[in-house]
């Protein structure tokens, strides 16, 4: 017979069943822990992938640069070496000009609305922040001192500037000729008396193509350059009116207010007080082999500006040959006195008187106020009265009447109300 083990007793069977149950429980627990470990590893892998994706997306965002608004809409590279900015200037106005005529002759009174000026400014820096550029196109409703044809889009500024450090820089292209007080200002958006200074309208050198050097220190700055022309439009190298030689220079010294604050003609309430003295010089020779005969601007100008924390006082004098405000080519002197003060944080009355020797209308007076609706010139309403003291021809050698808002001759006065948007 084969030996067979005796069947387990009841007590032994109970012990075996308990052991089997315990082993099954241990196996189930181990299986659960293994699954949890696999799940944890899967979660960790998902988190790692998500973090890597976020890092990649962030790096793409950094490479794409930033955009926003700062004196115009801008796009800047992540390293700061490239910047593109776009801005606009709009000047909408109502003008009423009165010219009383002799008895029995109808008065020459005119009035109406127009979009006086629209500027599109593109600017920025390239390669690195020391190389800046500016391209400004301008549309004017009618001819004036600086625009020979109205109703056309033309180049107003086109320049490249290189900063060499230690305050030195070079400017090449179409830019302001260093001469009088208004030479420091970009366009007309920062002037107190609206769109023009009468003094600069008559004696100014304008904007011309050339090359200039600029040095700016804490309290002194100087700019000097050579140009194709000085006081009439010339945008090409072979223009018959180009001068044989044309140089201009300006030096300024100040105490008090910093240069950035002085880049706005009006001193605002709360600004640091300051005093600025300026001296400008121009010299040129006509080009006899290029008919017709060209003007040869020569002369000097001095000016003094007191910025008194809400009040601004200005005095200017010029002695100039062949100024555009004269009826003939000759020497003439001129004077401008101007004052403005803030009655509130947003309302600024102003008055000015400009005199020009031997002009058809020697004196031109202005008085009015600025209402800064929003920001520092962002949205500004200028309303003024322009009063020529005299009834002679006011155009001089160029069409200045339309820009000033008065008739060419027989003037009584002009009323100008202009809304400016600077974006």
Give, region by region, the residue ranges found by the protein language model.
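N-terminal periplasmic/intermembrane-space "pro-region" immediately following the signal or transit peptide
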Residues: 1-91, 103, 259-262, 418, ...
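A broadly tuned "polar low-complexity/structure-edge" signature
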Residues: 43-46, 51, 83, 94, ...
């Amino acid at each position: 017979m084969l030996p067979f083990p005796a069947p387990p007793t009841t007590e032994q069977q109970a012990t075996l069943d308990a052991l089997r149950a315990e082993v099954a429980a241990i196996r189930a627990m181990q299986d659960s822990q293994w699954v949890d470990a696999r799940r944890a590893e899967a979660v960790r892998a998902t988190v790692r992938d998500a973090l890597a994706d976020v890092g990649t997306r962030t790096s793409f965002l950094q490479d794409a640069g930033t955009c926003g608004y700062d004196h115009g809409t801008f796009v800047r590279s992540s390293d700061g070496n490239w910047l593109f900015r776009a801005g606009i200037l709009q000047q909408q106005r109502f003008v009423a000009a009165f010219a009383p005529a002799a008895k029995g002759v109808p008065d020459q009174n005119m009035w109406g609305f127009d979009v006086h000026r629209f500027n599109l400014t593109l600017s920025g820096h390239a390669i690195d922040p020391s190389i800046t550029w500016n391209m400004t196109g301008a549309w004017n409703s009618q001819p004036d001192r600086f625009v020979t044809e109205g109703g056309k889009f033309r180049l107003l500024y086109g320049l490249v500037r290189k900063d060499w450090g230690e305050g030195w820089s070079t400017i090449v292209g179409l830019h302001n000729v260093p001469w009088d007080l208004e030479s420091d200002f970009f366009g007309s958006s920062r002037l107190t008396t609206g769109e023009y200074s009468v003094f600069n309208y008559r004696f100014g050198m304008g904007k011309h193509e050339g090359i200039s050097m600029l040095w700016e220190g804490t309290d002194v700055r100087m700019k000097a350059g050579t140009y194709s022309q000085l006081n009439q439009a010339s945008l090409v190298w072979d223009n018959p009116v180009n001068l044989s030689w044309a140089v201009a220079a300006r030096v300024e010294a100040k105490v008090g207010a910093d240069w950035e604050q002085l880049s706005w003609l009006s001193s605002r309430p709360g600004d640091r007080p300051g005093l600025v003295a300026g001296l400008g010089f121009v010299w040129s020779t006509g080009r006899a082999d290029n008919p017709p005969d060209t003007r040869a601007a020569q002369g000097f100008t001095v000016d003094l500006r007191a910025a008194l924390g809400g009040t601004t006082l200005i005095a200017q004098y010029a002695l100039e040959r062949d100024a555009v405000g004269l009826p003939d080519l000759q020497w003439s002197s001129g004077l401008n006195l101007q004052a403005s003060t803030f009655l509130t944080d947003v309302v600024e009355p102003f008055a000015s008187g400009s005199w020009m020797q031997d002009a058809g209308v020697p004196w031109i007076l202005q008085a009015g106020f600025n209402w800064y609706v929003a920001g520092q010139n962002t949205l500004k309403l200028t309303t003024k009265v322009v009063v020529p003291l005299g009834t002679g021809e006011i155009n001089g050698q160029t069409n200045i009447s339309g820009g000033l808002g008065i008739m060419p001759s027989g003037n009584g006065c002009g009323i100008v109300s202009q809304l400016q948007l600077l974006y």
